[in-house]
Regions:
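Conserved "landmark" site that anchors the functional core of diverse proteins
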Residues: 1-345
Length: 345
């Protein structure tokens, strides 16, 4: 049977995302997909999904949902919490990093994504028809329905019902988190368009994120990076990828993100490594950051290390019985008899 969730308030920039449209960049369609794939996978893991199910990507404040057909199991991942307004009149706080089963009529009021990005996963995933191999929203391409725009009030999100008789939910012993420190980059592919001083400035100063950011990219504020000459500020358009750091004629970098275009005519001074790309999703306006140059071999090791850390985090999940439920299986399996007494005189 199918579940159904109604969008009462979409919040700012709430979209549906999965792993994205891989293999379509040659026809000019961006990959899109999760800004922080590790965090989205964590949300999916808490409801028992495989890592590829579509989730709600939460970038702002004010999203409110109601279960129209259920029950529905959900989980939040990220620096976020929600008010759970149950149909029976009880009001609860639903923290992140654990699953919960919502009944028909229950509402969920989501707080702010304090670190700039959080995810809500639904057991069984969202049952929206994929377009070009993905359920990821990308409004610039004019995809139909909710995949071609951000969510709106009244949108209906078909999903799976959760009908397990087992009352246990899942939680993690600790949140999944990414390391701090400089954002690691590989220089190039057009670092020769910049002076040695520009490379030193890129790696040697603090940069500040600006309000000019969305799923396509973010502009940084700092000392301008000098091209070797005026002509070096433009190139014949070539391929770009999420993580590429473009530098237009004004010398201020633009870091491309998941919805980035597929080609561009600004030279690219460096590219953020795959292991650090998810961290960019959490850099709200005014955040300060630094870049560190590494080699390709070190970048591969960083990604392998991240996947090992992920597997260790996955092993910390544990089942628990929410307050108000009785775990009959555990009760029947317990030895509640501590001894026997003869009642005869």
């Amino acid at each position: 049977m199918s579940g159904l969730i109604e969008v009462l308030q979409p919040g700012f920039g709430t979209t549906i995302q999965d792993r994205g449209r891989r293999g379509q960049r040659h026809v000019g369609l961006p990959q899109s997909g999760w800004l922080d794939g590790t965090l989205a996978e964590a949300a999916n893991a808490l409801v028992g999904n495989n890592g590829g199910e579509a989730v709600l990507e939460l970038r702002g404040l004010g999203t409110e949902l109601r279960v129209q057909a259920g029950p529905v199991r959900i989980a939040l991942a990220g620096a976020i919490a929600a008010k759970w307004l149950r149909a029976d009149g009880k009001h609860l706080t639903l923290p992140a990093w654990q699953s919960a089963t919502l009944q028909v009529g229950d509402r969920l009021q989501l707080g702010a994504a304090e670190s700039g990005c959080a995810y809500l996963a639904i057991a069984g995933g969202l049952r929206l028809p994929p377009q070009l191999g993905s359920r990821s929203s990308y409004w610039r391409a004019g995809l139909t329905g909710v995949l071609g725009r951000a969510l709106r009030p009244g949108d209906q999100l078909p999903c799976s019902q959760w009908n397990s008789p087992d009352p246990k939910e899942w939680r993690s012993a600790s949140p999944w988190s990414l390391p701090d420190g400089p954002i690691r980059v590989i220089l190039g592919p057009q670092q020769d368009h910049f002076s040695p001083e520009a490379i030193a400035t890129l790696l040697g100063q603090d940069w500040e994120t600006t309000p000019e950011q969305d799923r396509m990219g973010m502009r940084l504020r700092g000392s301008a990076l000098q091209h070797v000459d005026a002509a070096a500020a433009d190139i014949v358009s070539d391929a770009v990828t999420p993580g590429a750091i473009q530098v237009p004629a004004n010398g201020l970098p633009i870091v491309l993100l998941a919805d980035s275009q597929t080609v561009g005519g600004y030279p690219k001074i460096a590219t953020v490594i795959g292991a650090d790309l998810p961290r960019l999703a959490h850099l709200k306006p005014g955040t300060r950051l630094r870049f560190q140059a590494i080699g390709l071999a070190e970048a591969r090791l960083a990604l392998q290390g991240q996947r090992s850390d992920w597997q260790r985090w996955l092993a910390t999940r544990e089942a628990f019985v929410p307050a108000g439920f009785i775990d009959l299986e555990a009760l029947y399996g317990s030895n509640l008899v501590s001894g026997m007494l003869r009642a005869e005189p």
